[in-house]
Amino acid sequence: ESVGFGSTSTNPCGEIILSPYDSCRLMLVNLTSFVKNAWKDNATFDFGKFGLTVRKAQRLMDDMIDLEIEQIDKIMHKVELDPEPDAVKQIEMDLWKNIRKAAINGRRTGLGITGLGDMLAMLGQRYGSDESIYTTEEVYKWLSLNSYEESIQLAKERGAFPAWDHKKEKDHPFISGIISELLEHRKEEYARYGRRNIANTTTAPAGSVSVLTQTTSGIEPSFMLHYT
């Protein structure tokens, strides 16, 4: 647990555990986009393309944090110019200062997936079967490895999140498990440069987004194929 980043609550849907004043930032990758020869016996999942997309998405999410901070600065400037007395505005100013500080110190992201149920169907795998469970585990492995590897690359380019401390997290079961899967030069870069984001991934219900992608939501199966 990093200083100032204890878990105190979640976002409304519960997929991201948040520290005080932290933000819920979500982005989803549509898994159906990576199925080759969908609905056929030779259907496959393009893990290489998926991994590259995850890396780009993680980089985009980090850019979004900078945009968030920029907008917070604009809001604070607007509040400063408001005609109300300083004593009245102070509560709001303190709130935005705390939100800004949390954004800068942790740079939390919530990268996930949607369309898992449809992806499995397109591959000819029954939801809940041993084969589908193995495929799902591989998808999440690629999501985590590529997301955290890109976060290391971003730390090399832009700097680690300020609260990062290698001594505190080098034996963390989750983080060390991911780092152990990386190539040696990435492990060395991690120890030297750290990570850009305090946390990277999550699994959201994805209800609204999946209406746009016209896929099953998040990791859920199709509940009914047709309605009357």
Where are these regions (language model features)?
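Glycine-rich phosphate/pyrophosphate-binding beta-alpha loops
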Residues: 204, 215-220
